[in-house]
Amino acid sequence: MDGVTVIGHPLVQHKLTIMRKKETSTAGFRRLLKEISTLLCYEVTRDLELTTERIETPLEETDAPVLEGKKLVFASILRAGNGLLEGMLELVPSARVAHIGVYRDHETLQAVEYFFKAPDNINERLVIVVDPMLATGNSSIAAVEKLKERGARNIRFLCLLAAPEGIRNFQGVHPDVPIFTASIDSHLNELGYIVPGLGDAGDRMYGTK
């Protein structure tokens, strides 16, 4: 599927399977989410541009590769997106963080915005939007729209699971934003949940219903 990268690394797929199991505990789900987010972050950042810096090792001076340009921004779609941040920030501790509050109205399935806060100079940074699920796509579409309104131009979207319906909706509005996911699942059910999915990621992460 054009514009979509499925991260099929064996460790990602193994951990995702355990997360899908209904008997996986809240603590186990949270731990696995942190682990898998680190692996996903590795993949979504694999083509970052590098420059060289003159350094001194214990043996001699040498030119060594370092990241070029402004620091990354990880933009979390609240609340479930926060579960991906911990592992990603361990991998890239210098990254800035944005928080975007949108929730899905369970009757209309539309996204309602209630919070937005992002770093300055977002137009000069690569922004990686994170949310465990790309279901209807409404929340993700709204979050990316808010980022673009603030000047963001280089955006990627990272999720654990995506539904074909959500991908179509998202790409219909934001064809310029590549999607990275661990799995494209079968479909959405009548309640807008991804099937087979893993349930509500936020509820499973925080032990709520």
From Swiss-Prot:
Binding site for uracil: 194, 199-201
GO BP annotations, alphabetical order: UMP salvage; uracil salvage
Annotated pathway: Pyrimidine metabolism; UMP biosynthesis via salvage pathway; UMP from uracil: step 1/1
Record's keyword annotation contains GTP-binding: yes
Molecular function per GO: GTP binding; magnesium ion binding; uracil phosphoribosyltransferase activity
Pfam families, per the entry: UPRTase
Cofactor(s) essential for the protein: Mg(2+)
Regulation: Allosterically activated by GTP.
Protein name: Uracil phosphoribosyltransferase
Residues holding 5-phospho-alpha-D-ribose 1-diphosphate: 79, 104, 131-139, 200
Keyword terms, alphabetized: Allosteric enzyme, Glycosyltransferase, GTP-binding, Magnesium, Nucleotide-binding, Transferase
CC cofactor note: Binds 1 Mg(2+) ion per subunit. The magnesium is bound as Mg-PRPP.
Role of this protein: Catalyzes the conversion of uracil and 5-phospho-alpha-D-ribose 1-diphosphate (PRPP) to UMP and diphosphate.
Signal peptide: none
SUPFAM superfamilies: PRTase-like
EC number(s) on file: 2.4.2.9
Gene label: upp
Family label: Belongs to the UPRTase family.
Superkingdom per UniProt: Bacteria
Reactions catalysed, as given in the entry: UMP + diphosphate = 5-phospho-alpha-D-ribose 1-diphosphate + uracil
